[in-house]
Amino acid sequence: MKKIIILLTTFFLLSGCTIPRAVFKSSLINQDDPRYNLVEVTPTLKLSAPDTVPKTIVDPVFAANNWHWTSLAKGDVLHITILSSGGAGYLSNNASGDRADFENILVTDSNTVQVPYAGTIPVSGLDVTQLADEIKKRLSRVVLNPQVIVTLTARTGAMVTVEGSGKTGRYPLEQSMNRLSHLLATAVAVENTSTDMMEVHVTRQQHYFTARLSDIYQYPGLDIALQPDDRITLRQVTEYVNVLGAAGVQGKHALVQRHSSVVDALALAKGLNDNLADPQAIFLYKHNEAEQAKQQMRKLNIYHVDMSQPNSVFLAQAIRVDNGDVIYISNASLTDFAKVKAAFDSFLTRGTNSF
């Protein structure tokens, strides 16, 4: 009789207690709440689709291809050979008969070269063949039938700089590497990088160009021609989605692609917790929309996804998740009952063992 009295007393004590919930219930969400609009995700819901074409506007400075990879640039080092049937030995100490050689001719910062008896020659926009023709024309006044050969011995002038997340360093511009995609193929370790989450910045004097690596590979208009002294900065883009509540793994999860969906985010969180989650009560809070709602003084939209429906996966795949968004998974109704039962069983066991 005494045992029965204790058990009944324990039951009535528990009936007056409430078990704290880790998350709120779906029943607490009100369609008419003055603070937000509850938007049901259904096949008829029309949301703005993610941009499939990048909005990057290429500055005309980058669109113009006014420098060719064969053009000489400041810092280049040349070897000039002059041949003449009338003798060229007097042109240089490094001469033999009808041949004179000039080594280590440097293209100066003013884009000129200094050639004995030919004077100072501007080389902007010239390649080695055009420079040889100009030297030949100038020497024809002092040398009989001159023949000029210009060789590029060190390509130290036409260089671009790579910094940031890639293989940093200085890279020469040449025939096989004169566009942005050529350089990125060398400077980026793609096997360890999501091209969708890599941002490329190009600085040219006071002008700037920015695009995602995947867009540069996909859209030819973004594959700009490089010029000497361009500075390329590679930056890994890190974006997160917060998955809270009855998820497999709660917390902040890094997105692995730009246009992620609710399904992608749930996969990062190891799905729903089978023992706790209510698949009918998944809510999406969009960070950008929250900021817009505050600025426009309107109610915030909260999107409700019912993953218990057969077509729910397709609907969830159509809902885009962006950086800073929050996905909340509610507890199932039976979860509270399970907590009460566990607590009651614990008291029951203690009461029985005390006798």
Curated annotation (Swiss-Prot):
Keywords for the protein's UniProt record, in alphabetical order: Capsule biogenesis/degradation, Cell outer membrane, Ion transport, Lipoprotein, Membrane, Palmitate, Polysaccharide transport, Porin, Signal, Sugar transport, Transmembrane, Transport
GO cellular component assignments: cell outer membrane; pore complex
Residues covalently joined to lipid (N-palmitoyl cysteine): C17
Residues annotated as signal peptide: 1-16
Pfam families cross-referenced by the UniProt entry: Poly_export
Compartment list: Cell outer membrane
InterPro entries per record: Poly_export (IPR049712), Poly_export_N (IPR003715)
Location, primary (coarse class): membrane
GO BP, sorted A to Z: monoatomic ion transport
Record-level Gene Ontology MF annotations: polysaccharide transmembrane transporter activity; porin activity
Role, per record: May form an ATP-driven capsule polysaccharide export apparatus, in association with the VexB, VexC and VexD proteins. May function as a membrane anchor for the polysaccharide. Possible porin properties.
Protein family membership: Belongs to the BexD/CtrA/VexA family.
Protein name: Vi polysaccharide export protein VexA/TviF
Organism: Salmonella typhi
Gene: vexA
